[in-house]
């Protein structure tokens, strides 16, 4: 059993190393994105925080689920990451279904979409950017509706 905060320390280290040298569309160090996603979650749940920090690691770096497991990342975190990671050849519909299948993944994806919809992150805003933002907002609302359905 890990002490409180230990998995979060590991997740931050893994994410920082994995995203080293990567930059977002606005030219900012990429690690700021997962940190912001974690902040948007406004949760004290350490595993949810880890999911936010690691949500792009498998998709965008050479890190594998095996690496994460060996580092002591919990199965709950890894299961959510499997739903949050776009697979090669996966359609948008299939990806959404994967996210909808995991409550944790839905919360992290909402925070991710919220940060991805922040136009202040871009250097200049094109029609293509606005189209992408609209797509993100639709997905955000779909997730919110699903979470509300599950409550009733």
Task: Indicate where each model-derived feature is located.
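Active-site helical microenvironments for divalent-metal-assisted chemistry
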Residues: 1-152
């Amino acid at each position: 059993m890990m002490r409180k905060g230990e998995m979060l320390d590991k997740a931050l280290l893994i994410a920082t190393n994995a995203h080293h040298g990567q930059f977002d569309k606005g030219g900012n160090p990429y690690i700021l994105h997962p940190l912001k996603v974690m902040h948007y979650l406004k949760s004290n749940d350490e595993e949810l925080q880890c999911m936010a920090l690691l949500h792009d690691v498998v998709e965008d770096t050479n890190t594998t689920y095996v690496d994460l497991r060996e580092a002591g990342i919990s199965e709950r975190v890894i299961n959510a990451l499997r739903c949050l990671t776009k697979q090669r050849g996966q359609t948008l519909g299939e990806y959404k279904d994967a996210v909808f299948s995991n409550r944790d993944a839905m919360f992290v994806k909402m925070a991710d979409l919220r940060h991805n919809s922040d136009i202040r992150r871009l250097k200049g805003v094109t029609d293509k950017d606005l189209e992408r933002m609209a797509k993100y907002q639709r997905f955000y609302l779909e997730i919110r509706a699903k979470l509300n359905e599950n409550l009733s």
